[in-house]
């Protein structure tokens, strides 16, 4: 009583406290960063190593395995995967959430150093690492095009100057430059000319390496001067290499230009990048795992004027893709939804109270509670994102509930003729405990979410804390500012004044009277209501089992990403043609705004494409509908497939895949994996629940096996090292020397000119110089035959691995897909040597599915414990919790009606309903207990009176919560995929709960009261006088 009076009778102090909360909130709002979702990126580090010309199997055994053994000892590694392809190995380390990325990077460098002695010689550089996830979609793609500059020169400028500058921007984790490679001097040898001159490839390589030397020469010094010695020991251009003498034949000099074509070219000619049908260099920018995407993009955009200033006029720099516009649009939609929710909630209050002054009170209390929450969000290190703003949108209905309960009770006393300050004090005292009970029990719902681990726990933590803080501030405001404003702004009125019977008031009276009549009938037919109540419990269980489930709603971010997978024996020239064909098909689609892509490198038969769609307001279709339309057109392209998927704000796992979900096969026996993977992939491809099924296991690449006759080689004076060196020099694009320039280092690349290696007959023209200096053709000591070989070798941990990726057809949920895969694996009878498990997002979904029921039960148990403490009773909390089954039925039926799967967002809605619908029961039970204690009423009379007295605030709070969530259901535009499931769940649960709990709660109250009396009689013992 004294606590409430302190604020009621000190209006200036109360107003200043509210103003301070508001000002802190405004400051916090201005300082909060912006993001699509809470920070949930796993710390990921990518280790890269190269050995040009080495086969995938060689890279896996000699490079990947030693590194994996060393890296696998690092603490906190959640998952380690590797992929080895032609001349390249990439290892992805995913760490636990609690692992600091910088500390992990230091451990990674130490592990690389420890494995260095086990790595093969001939590697052009030490393994390197980057703090970025290569499977993440780039946050921005820049393109460089030019009519006059070569692709190699553009690539050099991009990688040497632009990429270095961009990498220094806060938040940037990796700048991957694609579309070509660094400039190089390429030496294309003529095997026939070499044979005629008696020059071996090794002799050419040694001559070039010896002629291009960068060594310190020292200085000459006398008593007065010092001269630095400088020589022309370096060759920098093709023109300088051409006259190089590499051999003498009968006293005549053989120059490099006599036996080779020497050109200024690039290190790897098998690379191509394009943007909208034009050759281009791509700068694909990815953020650090812990970085904010909006701040990072803003930093890049702020740097663009400086970048454009340093670019020559012949180069055109454009932004081909930017993830931030759709994120900003989505957040703007949520902010508008929040404003609409506040307006609707205040409208509900006005319609019920029919007073401008009375409506002004919650109109002040709601913004103070919501704005004050921003300060706490800033202190907690949160961001303005879809989930935190959705929490505030839902909180609109919650925070007004507390003000409504206090305001309505004070208004009831004023209508009875009590003076304003006295009514404020008396009304607040009566419902103070009720408001505290509602708020604390609502916050208790979110305690299990705060304790939840893994990605779902990290994802929902901001939502739970934001909502809890808003409720906490609302509780304080409702018990301080609201009664003060009621006491000083509202006026007393005569009992049963006429306005109560006008408009909405008349309707409310009629509803209340009808409710009273129906409630009497219900209380006389409690068994029927009991059957209905038990039926809702059973229906909950059945609906939860039957409803399709997924991890997170499929988002339309306006960006598509596609992986190209072509025939495994395709040439680079043919692959480049496939890239152009696919780009033309996509570019012709009316919903596409921009398309970029690249192919080449270590995986000749693959490529990547990035597609920017037009804004949502300029297209009718969703991203998934566009993918479905394009899939039909793209399937007509022979010899290659393009797998499209919508880029999501949440992507789990470090392994790159051509689809959204992955199922990984592991085995310690590589032959067993290679035997069963095609069978499993074929079976999964036939499932109607899966689309775009593909695998990263590619074992049918064309290979030419050379079999050495070691006896013949020994007789001819040739060793295996010389033969292998011949092949590497001929076909391996061997980097034989380094050209040092002020801004970068470039390579001299040697191979037999591709004109002479167009078919297998090129092997017949190869020869080795033996120990006696004679040229011995390769065919003298080797035979060759075609075979199949893997284009890549993949590991997970230290086991051989193959990942089958898949998308979901329209109308199929992830739960249906995972059940179909598990069923198929059982039917196939896969041996124990091959183990299958979901990975990435599908793995997190499986883990979430296993914990969903536990989380719901934990939330209910937590609420029960809190209510038990507040009411000092085991029975009354059960009465309050009896409202939950009807809400669950309504939520699940609404999801089925709107064809929405049960996702993590819908789970949030269920948790919220646990907190919302019990408020009705709390108001009924509180007043019934008070009536029994102070009024001497029977339980039947008490609960009947409580239901009628609390009918108006129950209707107000329920409608306020319903109208607060309704804009989420009706919202469209960017990000609506996240908002709608939450709104559908809450609205459906509230409607069903309101229809049933007004009748089931009083029946359950009487049932437990009778049960309590019967139990107390059985346990009572007669008193015996002594």
Swiss-Prot record:
Keywords in alphabetical order: Cell inner membrane, Cell membrane, Membrane, Transmembrane, Transmembrane helix, Transport
Record-annotated membrane-spanning stretches: 15-35, 333-353, 360-380, 387-407, 431-451, 463-483, 528-548, 853-873, 897-917, 953-973, 984-1004
Ribosomal protein keyword on record: no
Membrane protein topology class: Multi-pass membrane protein
Coiled-coil region: none
Superkingdom field: Bacteria
Subcellular location: Cell inner membrane
An annotated Gene Ontology molecular function: xenobiotic transmembrane transporter activity
Major localization class: membrane
GO CC aspect terms: plasma membrane
Oligomeric and partner information: Part of a tripartite efflux system composed of MdtA, MdtB and MdtC. MdtC forms a heteromultimer with MdtB.
Entry's family note: Belongs to the resistance-nodulation-cell division (RND) (TC 2.A.6) family. MdtC subfamily.
The protein's name in its UniProt record: Multidrug resistance protein MdtC
């Amino acid at each position: 009583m004294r606590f409430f009076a302190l604020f009621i009778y000190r209006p200036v102090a109360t107003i200043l406290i509210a103003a301070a909360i508001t000002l802190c909130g405004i400051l916090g709002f201005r300082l909060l960063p912006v993001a699509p979702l809470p920070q949930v990126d796993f710390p990921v580090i990518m280790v890269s190593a190269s050995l040009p010309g080495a086969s995938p199997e060689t890279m896996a055994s000699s490079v990947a395995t030693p590194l994996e053994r060393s890296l696998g000892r690092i603490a906190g590694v959640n998952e380690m995967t590797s992929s080895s392809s032609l001349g390249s190995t990439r290892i992805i380390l995913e760490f636990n959430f609690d692992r600091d990325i910088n500390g992990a990077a230091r451990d990674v460098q130490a592990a690389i150093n420890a494995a260095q002695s086990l790595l093969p010689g001939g590697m052009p550089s030490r393994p390197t690492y980057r703090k970025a996830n290569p499977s993440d979609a780039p946050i921005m793609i820049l393109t460089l095009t030019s009519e006059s500059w070569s692709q190699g020169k553009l690539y050099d400028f991009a990688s040497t100057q632009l990429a270095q500058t961009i990498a220094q921007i806060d938040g940037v984790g990796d700048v991957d430059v694609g579309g070509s490679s660094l400039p190089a001097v390429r030496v294309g040898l003529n095997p026939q000319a070499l044979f005629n001159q008696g020059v071996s490839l090794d002799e050419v390589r040694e001559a070039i390496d010896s002629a291009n030397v960068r060594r310190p020469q020292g200085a000459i010094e006398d008593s007065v001067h010092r001269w630095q010695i400088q020589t022309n020991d370096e060759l920098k251009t093709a023109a300088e290499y051409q006259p190089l003498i590499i051999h003498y034949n009968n006293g005549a000099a053989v120059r490099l230009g006599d036996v080779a074509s020497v050109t200024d070219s690039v290190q790897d000619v098998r690379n191509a990048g394009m943007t909208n049908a034009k050759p281009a260099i791509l700068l694909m920018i990815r953020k650090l795992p812990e970085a904010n995407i909006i701040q990072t993009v803003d930093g890049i955009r702020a740097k663009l004027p400086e970048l454009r200033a340093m670019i020559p006029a012949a180069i055109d720099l454009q932004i081909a893709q930017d993830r931030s516009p759709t994120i900003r649009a989505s957040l703007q939609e949520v902010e508008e939804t929040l404003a609409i929710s506040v307006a609707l909630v205040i409208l509900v209050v006005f319609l019920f109270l029919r007073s401008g002054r009375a409506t002004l009170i919650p109109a002040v209390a709601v913004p103070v509670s919501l704005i004050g929450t921003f300060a706490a969000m800033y202190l907690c290190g949160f961001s303005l994102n879809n989930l935190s703003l959705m929490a505030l949108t839902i909180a609109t209905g919650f925070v007004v509930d507390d003000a409504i309960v206090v305001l309505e009770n004070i208004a009831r006393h004023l209508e009875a003729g009590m003076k304003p300050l006295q009514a404020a004090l008396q009304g607040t005292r009566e419902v103070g405990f009720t408001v505290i009970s509602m708020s604390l029990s609502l916050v208790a719902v979110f305690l299990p979410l705060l304790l939840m681990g893994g990605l779902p726990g990290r994802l929902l933590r901001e939502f739970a804390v934001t909502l809890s803080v808003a409720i906490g501030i609302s509780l304080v405001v409702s018990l301080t500012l609201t009664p003060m404003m009621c006491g000083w702004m509202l006026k007393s009125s005569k009992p049963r004044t006429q306005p109560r019977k006008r408009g909405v008031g008349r309707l409310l009276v009629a509803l209340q009277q009808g409710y009273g009549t129906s409630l009497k009938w219900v209380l006389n037919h409690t068994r029927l209501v009991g059957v209905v109540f038990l039926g809702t419990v059973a229906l909950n269980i059945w609906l939860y089992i039957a409803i399709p489930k997924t991890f997170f709603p499929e988002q339309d971010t306006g960006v598509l990403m596609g992986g190209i997978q072509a025939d495994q024996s395709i040439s680079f020239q043919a692959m480049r043609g496939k890239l152009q064909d696919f780009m033309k098909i996509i570019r012709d689609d009316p919903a596409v705004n921009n398309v970029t892509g690249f192919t080449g490198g270590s995986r000749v038969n693959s490529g990547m494409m990035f597609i920017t769609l037009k804004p949502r307001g300029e297209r009718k279709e969703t991203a998934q509908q566009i993918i479905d339309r394009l899939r039909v057109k793209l399937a007509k392209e022979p010899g290659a497939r393009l797998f499209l998927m919508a880029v999501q704000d949440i992507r789990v796992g470090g392994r790159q895949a051509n689809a959204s979900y992955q199922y990984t096969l592991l085995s310690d026996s590589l032959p067993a994996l290679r035997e069963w993977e095609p069978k499993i992939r074929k079976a999964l491809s036939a499932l109607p629940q899966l689309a775009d099924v593909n695998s990263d296991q590619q074992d049918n690449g064309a290979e030419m096996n050379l079999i050495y006759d070691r006896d013949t080689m020994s007789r001819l004076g040739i060793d295996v090292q010389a033969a292998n060196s011949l092949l590497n020099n001929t076909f391996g694009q061997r980097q034989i020397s380094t050209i040092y320039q002020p801004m970068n280092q470039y390579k001299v690349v040697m191979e037999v000119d591709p004109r002479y290696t167009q078919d297998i007959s090129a092997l017949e023209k190869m020869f080795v110089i033996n120990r006696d200096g004679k040229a011995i053709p390769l065919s003298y000591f080797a035979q060759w035959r075609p075979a199949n070989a893997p284009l890549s070798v993949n590991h997970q941990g230290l086991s051989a691995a193959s990942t089958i990726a898949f998308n979901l057809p329209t109308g199929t949920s992830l739960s249906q897909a995972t059940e179909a895969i598990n069923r198929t694996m059982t039917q196939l009878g896969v041996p124990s040597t091959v183990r299958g498990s979901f990975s990435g997002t599908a793995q997190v979904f499986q883990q979430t599915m296993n914990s969903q029921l536990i989380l719901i039960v934990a939330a209910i148990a937590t609420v029960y414990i809190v209510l038990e403490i507040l009411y000092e009773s085991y029975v009354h909390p059960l009465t309050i919790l009896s409202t939950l089954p009807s809400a669950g039925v309504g939520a699940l039926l609404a999801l089925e009606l709107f064809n929405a799967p049960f996702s993590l967002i819908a789970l949030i809605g269920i948790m919220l309903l646990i907190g919302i619908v019990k408020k009705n029961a709390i108001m009924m039970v509180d007043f019934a207990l008070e009536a029994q204690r102070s009024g001497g009423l029977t339980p039947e009379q008490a609960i009947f009176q409580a239901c009628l007295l609390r009918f108006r605030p129950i209707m107000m709070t329920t409608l306020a919560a319903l109208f607060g969530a309704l804009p989420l259901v009706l919202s469209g535009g960017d990000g609506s995929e996240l908002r709608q499931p939450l709104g559908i769940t809450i609205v459906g649960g509230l409607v069903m709960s309101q229809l049933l709990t007004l009748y089931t709660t009083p029946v359950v109250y009487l049932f437990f009261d009778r049960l309590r009396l019967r139990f107390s009689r059985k346990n009572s013992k007669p008193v015996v006088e002594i």
